[in-house]
UniProtKB/Swiss-Prot annotation:
This is Cysteine desulfurase IscS. It catalyses: (sulfur carrier)-H + L-cysteine = (sulfur carrier)-SH + L-alanine. Pyridoxal 5'-phosphate binds at A75, T76, N155, Q183, S203, G204, H205, T243. The gene is iscS. The active site is at C328.
Amino acid sequence: MKLPIYLDYSATTPVDPRVAEKIMQFMTMDGTFGNPASRSHRFGWQAEEAVDIARNQIADLVGADPREIVFTSGATESDNLAIKGAANFYQKKGKHIITSKTEHKAVLDTCRQLEREGFEVTYLAPQRNGIIDLKELEAAMRDDTILVSIMHVNNEIGVVQDIAAIGEMCRARGIIYHVDATQSVGKLPIDLSQLKVDLMSFSGHKIYGPKGIGALYVRRKPRVRIEAQMHGGGHERGMRSGTLPVHQIVGMGEAYRIAKEEMATEMERLRGLRNRLWNGIKDIEEVYLNGDLEHGAPNILNVSFNYVEGESLIMALKDLAVSSGSACTSASLEPSYVLRALGLNDELAHSSIRFSLGRFTTEEEIDYTIELVRKSIGRLRDLSPLWEMYKQGVDLNSIEWAHH
């Protein structure tokens, strides 16, 4: 077993060796390196064919028509293109958008930008388990609501929203529905031929593909329109200009092809490992599960260890690559906004660790993790005056702390 153990698959994944091998065939002079927009020679035609195959592989995994797949530089761009693109196109109908407080920053900050441009945004608070109450969503819908953006799987706590039900509600009212599926695609079944979802964002690097490539699904029937945010040569049906990075697209396509083949068995394996990890640590005193195992993605476990500071715990667990919060915001020392939205106090939010498992995680690694976590929590609590006071029965909330 190699140390450190990588348990941060929700931040990024290694590229699958099969994907890396494929990418290499589309880079050099003796490979297929042409520009797919070059219509006058074989180099361009071969590149275009490779892009078409990848587009089909991505559409295949999610039950879409390949013509509905628009390539972008990643899920952040897909979220921006979907939300700004739809808001700008449909603003004559209304200027009200609904999202949730636990969305990824790529959705929240895009909505904040639209607020500065005169749109009105309602941010729904989830229930304690992280799930959005559909009655609250319905109550928030107005005549001038043009867009709802609610993610499929949360990147920090792994809860799965009922996107099928939300889609039905939106379609019945003629509201565009965008789903950020970055954390769910290839891990949970998605069938866009059945779901009433209009726009869906995908990433390459969360599913063993390369970084820097993503896609946006844009429904054709009933037709959904978006305004381009990137202008140039009119690539991708005019929705996203820019020369297509064939090697990255081929890598993403291959990753999605593999995911389709292996998803069912991999889901069960990961769920087993996640449950093994939780069962191994849940009897530690003052341990809280954030989210909901029953309505949760099979690969994410978010746990708070009371009376232990999250940053010091991460230092103590130096043999494990884990995170407190998401990688995109873990550079700041603010407690996770997702956990705060669930109603956790600052202390519990600060003492949270996200374990995210993946294709190369083994049972041996999980057992080592359990042992290490148990040891580290014990050691850190031995050093903690707060833990000592708690064990003596002192109500820590009633203490007036001196402010210097």
